[in-house]
Amino acid sequence: MAEFRDDQASRLCDNCKKEIPVFNFTIHEIHCQRNIGVCPVCKEPFPKSDMDIHMAAEHCQVTCKCNKKLEKRQLKQHAETECPLRLAVCQHCDLELSVVKLKEHEDYCGARTELCGSCGRNVLVKELKTHPEVCGRVEEEKRTEAAIPPEAYDEPWSQDRIWIASQLLRQIEALDPPMRLPGRPLQAFEADPFYSRTTSQRSMAAQFPVQNNLFEEQERQERNRSRQSPKDSAENNAHLDFMLALSLQNEGQATSMVEQGFWESVPEADPARAGPTSLGDIKGAADEILLPCEFCEELYPEELLIDHQTSCNPSHALRSLNTGSSSIRGVEDPGTIFQNFLQQATSNQFDTLMGLSSSAAVEDSIIIPCEFCGVQLEEEVLFYHQDQCDQRPATANHRAVEGIPAQDSQPENTSAELSRRRVKHQGDLSSGYMDDVKPESVKGPTYSMSPNRTMNNVASCNRLLNLPSGPRSDCQRSPPGVLKLNNSDSQDIRGQMRGSQNGPIASGHAPVIHSIQNLYPENFAPSFPHGSPGRYGAGGRSEGGRSSRVSPAAAGYHSRAAKAKPPKQQGAGDAEEEEE
């Protein structure tokens, strides 16, 4: 039967999309179109009578607890694999938490420590699974490190520790042609002044890291040279140990010990083993490309030319070590070079050596301390510093105001700073002028009056008339705009006026009463107190004629315009007085 079914042909039903045998296809097609329908969502064939149930059970929209909407048939798979609020178990404490909070909880829970029963160390909880693999190995490594002496291996070189020293050494070596430093024999080690150091001195912190770095750099260079020349390995190893001992002994020593001829006290090695020390031997080496320096025109090897030109440049910062001469420089002893370098390094001249100083130091400059703050400055800068010094006392700023007298008429609320800033113009009277001339007003002023002097400055007279009033010794107030004459002048004028009333006066001796404006010169400054404004009737005129007496009670008042009127000729004034 199976073979028969396999051999027979089949056709695809258009309704249910299934393969139907050919001999049953007609019956199936009629039955399928009548009773079976296809779901429009999932495209699966279902009986038409069960289509509504299928749509309600499988394809209705539901909401998950994570507020996501999806079909009901997909809810189960979403809740098991995709929902962020599904429960999960912590791998450290077996506590069920939502997936959203699980990561934060595991980080916190895994940071706890538990005591290992095997090695006795506190181990993190998150490392408990991998700890048995390394348990006990840390203690073995520590024991191994303690068993190995420090001299058995070289300390790894730190770039940030020796960078400064290496750069300085390169610049110093570039000053002169490269040469090998003379070795120091081991028998000189016992004669070294630093050999008698105690254990406490060896444990002190290094006060001169620059010297130590220099020794270590030199030690590394000697090690490299020893690799290039195996025949001198014994000498180089001895020199290496000796330089290491020097670097250890130099720690914690005072600066004075370095300056007391440390480099001269050590005996030099055999000159025969020191290698070439002359400039001609080094430059005459075979198979070397020599190029001239663009500054000093000397020949140097190709690999050292850049370093030499950097140090030979006149604008380079190494002015203290480089003489700047364009001539051929002599070969200097390396011990002298290192000694000068150490002395400059210990005297706080690192900025000059490294090229960090902004400008060269001022030579032959006098350093004087500030008298207020004590800061030591150069002579050229000290004057400007003391003028603006913060420590300067307050009394030093009021020297210019000591000679100014106090002002009586100044209001109380006027600040001293405001009065100090007021500018005094030429010709103005000072505010304390009246206080200075009070004693003179008591004695009585004496003036040399010239009767023939005419008024030629009305403005000066008006300024004198409008001066402010001041205190007076007597109770009587003076007339406005009239200056008080002394006793002798007033008696002469009164006598002449009385003589004119009694009889005729000769034309040659006519009394003249001059206007008050022309009694004094235009630049005359009075030195007596002024009275308050009042009324004075010296120029009063009545209908019957001019009165011959001066009466303060019955006197009239002339306006300012009448006072400013130009004076008459002297002859006309005399004739008018004779008519009266």
Swiss-Prot record:
- Biological process according to GO: negative regulation of innate immune response
Q: What is the effect of changing residue 294 to A?
A: No effect on TRAF6-induced NF-kappa-B activation
N-acetylalanine: modified positions? 2
Chain positions covered by the region annotation Disordered: 395-453, 468-509, 524-580
Q: Read off the Gene3D superfamilies from this record.
A: Zinc/RING finger domain, C3HC4 (zinc finger)
**What tissues harbor this protein?**
Expressed in skeletal muscle, brain, liver, kidney, spleen and bone marrow. Expression depends on STAT1.
Q: Phenotype when inactivated?
A: Mice show no gross developmental abnormalities, but exhibit an increased susceptibility to LPS-induced septic shock and are more sensitive to poly(I:C) shock, suffering more severe hepatic damage than wild-type animals. In response to LPS-stimulation, bone marrow-derived dendritic cells display an increased production of pro-inflammatory cytokines, such as IL6, TNF and IL12, as well as elevated IKK and JNK activation, compared to wild-type mice. Mutant embryonic fibroblasts are more resistant to vesicular stomatitis virus (VSV)-induced cytopathic effect.
Q: Which GO terms describe its molecular function?
A: zinc ion binding
| Zn finger (TRAF-type) location | 27-103
| Expression induction or repression | By lipopolysaccharide (LPS), IFNB1 and IFNG, IFNB1 being most rapid and potent inducer (at protein level). Not induced by anti-inflammatory cytokines, such as IL4 and IL10, which also inhibit LPS induction of TRAFD1.
Q: Record's Pfam families? A: TRAFD1-XIAF1_ZnF (PF21366)
Q: PANTHER family this protein is in?
A: TRAF-TYPE ZINC FINGER DOMAIN-CONTAINING PROTEIN 1 (PTHR16295:SF19), TRAF-TYPE ZINC FINGER PROTEIN-RELATED (PTHR16295)
Protein name in the entry: TRAF-type zinc finger domain-containing protein 1
Species the sequence originates in: Mus musculus
Q: Which gene encodes it?
A: Trafd1
